[in-house]
C-alpha cells in the first residue's frame, strides 16, 4: 500500500487536495482509502467525511472520543489497515504520525511556526509555497505520481529493530533516500502476515515464536519438505 498524509494549518486546503488526489488515483483504476483526523466528535453528516465517501472505497475518521467505522474509543491508525484495503491510503491530519511521509499544505496561517509540521517527513508540498529544499508540486498529476513512487507506511511499533529509536527515525531516512521501507524488520522478516491484504508488523521476538511453532508443526505433516511455505488462515 502506498500512503501519504496531508498536513497543514486550518483552511490550507487539505480536504480539497485530498479529494483531488483521490479522484486522480481512481481515474487510474486504483482503489483508494481515506482517513480523516478531527479535533471534534465525528458524525456521518460531517461535510468533509461525506465528500471523501463519495469518491473513496473506504473512509475512516479518527476523533478524540470515537473512531469512525463506529468503534468506541480512539484507535491506532495501523489497527484500521485491515479495514482500509486499497492501493493508496490518504490520511488528512495526524500531524504527530511519524510512520508515514507527508505532503505539506502551506497556504494557511503559519504564525505558530513550522516545527509542528515535521518537514523532515515531507516528500513535497502542494501549491505555491514550500519550506527550504522541499520540492513543490503544482499539479495533482505531479503530486499523485510522487505519492505512487515514494509513499509508504510503517507499522508504528517503535521496536528499534531497524537500529533507530522509533519508526519516525526510519521514515526520515526513507524520505532522505538513505533507507528503504525494507529496512523495517518488523515488516520484512522470515514470516509475513497480512489480514485482508494489509501487512501486519511484529517484533522479532513474536516472529521467532510464531515461525518456530509453525515450522515444528509443519515438519510433522506427511509430504513435508524444506522450502518456502504458504499458509492461508481465516481469522
Predicted segments — roles?
Residues 20-72:
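N-terminal phosphate/diphosphate-binding loop that engages ATP/GTP or pyrophosphate donors
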Residues 156-172, 186:
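Local cysteine-cluster metal-coordination motifs and their immediate loop/turn environment
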Residues 10:
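The conserved Walker
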Residues 6:
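Hydrophobic anchor at the beta1->P-loop junction of P-loop NTPases
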Residues 14:
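Conserved lysine of the Walker
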Amino acid at each position: 500500500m502506498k500512503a501519504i498524509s496531508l498536513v497543514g494549518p486550518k483552511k490550507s486546503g487539505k480536504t480539497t487536495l485530498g479529494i483531488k488526489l483521490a479522484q486522480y488515483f481512481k481515474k487510474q483504476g486504483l482503489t483508494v482509502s481515506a482517513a480523516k483526523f478531527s479535533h471534534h466528535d465525528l458524525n456521518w453528516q460531517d461535510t468533509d467525511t461525506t465528500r471523501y465517501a463519495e469518491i473513496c472505497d473506504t473512509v475512516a475518521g479518527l476523533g478524540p472520543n470515537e473512531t469512525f467505522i463506529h468503534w468506541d474509543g480512539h484507535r491506532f491508525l495501523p489497527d484500521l489497515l485491515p479495514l482500509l484495503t486499497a492501493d493508496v491510503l490518504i490520511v488528512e491530519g495526524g500531524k504527530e504520525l511519524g510512520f508515514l511521509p507527508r505532503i505539506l499544505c502551506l497556504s494557511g496561517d503559519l504564525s505558530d511556526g513550522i516545527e509542528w509540521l515535521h518537514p523532515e517527513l515531507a516528500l513535497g508540498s502542494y501549491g505555491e509555497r514550500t519550506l527550504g529544499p522541499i520540492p513543490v508540486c503544482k499539479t495533482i498529476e505531479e503530486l499523485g505520481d510522487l505519492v505512487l513512487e515514494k509513499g509508504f507506511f510503517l507499522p508504528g511499533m517503535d521496536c528499534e529493530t531497524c537500529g533507530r529509536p522509533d519508526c519516525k527515525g526510519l521514515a526520515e531516512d526513507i524520505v532522505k533516500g538513505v533507507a528503504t521501507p525494507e529496512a523495517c524488520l518488523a515488516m520484512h522478516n522470515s514470516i509475513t502476515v497480512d489480514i485482508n491484504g494489509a501487512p501486519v508488523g511484529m517484533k522479532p521476538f513474536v516472529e521467532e515464536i510464531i515461525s518456530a511453532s509453525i515450522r515444528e508443526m509443519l515438519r510433522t505433516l506427511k509430504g513435508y519438505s524444506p522450502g518456502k511455505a504458504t499458509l492461508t488462515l481465516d481469522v
